Amino acid sequence: MNSSLRIIGLVIARDEWPLLRLSITHALLNHVDHVWVLDHSSGDGTRDGLERLTEIWGERLRVVRLCGTPFWQEASTSLILELIGATRDDWIYVFDADEFAITPSGTSIREMLGSVGPDFSSVRYEVDNWISTATFDECDHSQYSQLRLRAIANHFFDLPSDILSDEIQRGTLNFFDVPFPSKVIVRGGGPTWLSAGAHLLKQPVAGEEFRLCPRDFRVAHFPLLSEQRLHKKAAHGELLVKQGFPTWHGWQNQMLFRLSSTGQLNNFWKRHSVGAPEADAYGTTPSIADDSSFVEAIAPTLAFLAGTASDEAEAHHLLGQESGDTLVSASAAIGAIRSVQVVADAIAAEQDRQVANSSLRVDQLERENSVLRQALEESEKRCRAMQSSTSWLLTRPVRAIGRLLK
């Protein structure tokens, strides 16, 4: 194994406290050397909470605060990757506050990444959705031992996000029926551009992708952990709509905003949590499996936090305080990176259009050529049929005399 290998975690969070405390600690205890946090305009207890968490982890935890900039996730991620200054010996693991890595007992992602060859620039892993209880309290650590239900997604679903959103809103499809896309861990050492959500490595395009077996490494994802978090997501969806993001960007949160606007969010929660009274309206329920792997994986993290000087009960009393920019130039830097991204995406889109138009023109010419060949073949068939007909043979002398008279 490469002794100089480092694994650096990166999480972008907005109003994610106290869950963020748990996910950062879980990553630092088990899998990564450092965690960088981009606190994006949080207005809850995130700022004070991160300061207290930094007292525990010291230099292993770095915080960048950003305020007043739209949620340009790809540009923000690229900025932090530049600040990290990762080398080719480093791997970047981008995770969300509601994601927790699961490995077989006693193993770390470090061992797996250490065996990945130099030709691989990214490592792909699977993400499974977990289902929460109807009255879940994120501040009560004892309740995490109840999270044993893993959603069984229907992998035959491959529909556009707008159709998925409409079907879920109507209740004909359950949110947990939809598979969550796999994600990638990427190698450092150069300009890196990750898609939103870290589902795809856009740059560099060179290099192969290594795929991890889910038995060795997967992530437990809690998209709907509590009713309080559900309302936060709906509020974030409203922000995305107001800022003019397309419907596919954060489509889940935009869908929750629409459900909230029509008074259907409470019924949605009943159909997507365990132990709630029956939903008020028709709707499908998720397929589930009893799985203790998350409970087993999170137990050491809960024990560690229980032994720290900062008691988790303080999470209830942290005052909401907007997080200002850590760096004066952070907003400008992200704006500049975003502009570069827009230009790059526009160039790529134009190239795609040109290729598509060329392909369409080639297809059109091939179709026209096919029609002409078919017409020529039909004409030749008719000519041969006429030449072999009895009337044609009987009138051959007459045609010969006619040619002589000319």
Report residues per predicted region:
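Short, acidic, metal-binding catalytic loop of nucleotide-sugar glycosyltransferases
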Residues: 25-34
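Short acidic/polar active-site loop segments enriched in Thr and Asp
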Residues: 33, 90, 121
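Catalytic-site signature of metal-activated, phosphate-bearing donor transferases
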Residues: 74-76, 103-321, 328
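N-proximal low-complexity "stem/linker" segments adjacent to membrane-targeting elements
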Residues: 1-25
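The conserved acidic donor/metal-binding loop of glycosyltransferases
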Residues: 96-100
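Active-site-proximal specificity loops/subdomain of glycosyltransferases
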Residues: 49-94
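Boundary detector for helix-to-coil junctions that initiate low-complexity/charged tails
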Residues: 310-406
